[in-house]
């Protein structure tokens, strides 16, 4: 084996050391700042092997099916916090039944919350006039797409909301929000 002499070993000068230190610091800060951005663009996945995420009321409490049905009449469309905390309409379809889907209340035009207009029997966006029928299908623009939908299920009296991945029954196409 040959031994290297000190003349063969490159030395790191003070300037090169400071450059590497600065580069490492800036890289670390940049990666730390980019992490939340990357998380934002990563699709949400409902955790666990269960039926989804608990729907929450306006106070952040889990929604129970029996409690919801006892305080909301047939045909009622009221908002809960659904997937990702988005406002989602739960629809009471019978004295003891909630529809198997919920309608995301975020307008597909510019993101306004779309209220239900019971007199017109449709969702009407207050921002730019987009209108959606009772299932959330767009009937008048400028919104380009129907409102997103999510599965609604009941397990142990808890209302659960989960991602809709099947064909959109309103349009016959794959869901755009998936």
UniProtKB/Swiss-Prot annotation:
GO terms for cellular component: plasma membrane-derived thylakoid membrane. InterPro entries: Cyt_b6_f_Rieske, Rieske_2Fe-2S, Rieske_2Fe-2S_sf, Rieske_Fe-S_prot, Rieske_Fe-S_prot_C, TAT_signal. Belongs to the Rieske iron-sulfur protein family. [2Fe-2S] cluster binds at residues 107, 109, 125, 128. Its main location: membrane. Keywords: 2Fe-2S, Disulfide bond, Electron transport, Iron, Iron-sulfur, Membrane, Metal-binding, Thylakoid, Translocase, Transmembrane, Transmembrane helix, Transport. This is Cytochrome b6-f complex iron-sulfur subunit. It is found in: Cellular thylakoid membrane.
């Amino acid at each position: 084996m040959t031994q290297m002499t000190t003349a063969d070993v490159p030395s790191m000068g003070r300037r090169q050391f400071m450059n590497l230190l600065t580069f490492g610091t800036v890289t670390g800060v940049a990666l730390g700042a980019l992490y939340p951005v990357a998380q934002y663009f990563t699709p949400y996945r409902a955790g666990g092997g269960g039926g989804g995420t608990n729907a929450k009321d306006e106070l952040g409490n889990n929604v129970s099916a029996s409690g919801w049905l006892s305080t909301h009449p047939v045909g009622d469309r009221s908002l809960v916090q659904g997937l990702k905390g988005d406002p989602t309409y739960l629809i009471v379809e019978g004295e003891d039944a909630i529809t198997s889907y919920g309608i995301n209340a975020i307008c597909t035009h510019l993101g306004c919350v779309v209220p239900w207009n019971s007199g017109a029997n449709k969702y009407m966006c207050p921002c730019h006039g987009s209108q959606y029928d009772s299932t959330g299908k767009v009937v008048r623009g400028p919104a380009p797409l129907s409102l997103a939908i999510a599965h609604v299920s009941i397990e142990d009296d808890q209302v659960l909301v989960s991602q809709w991945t099947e064909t959109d029954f309103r349009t016959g196409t794959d869901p755009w929000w998936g």
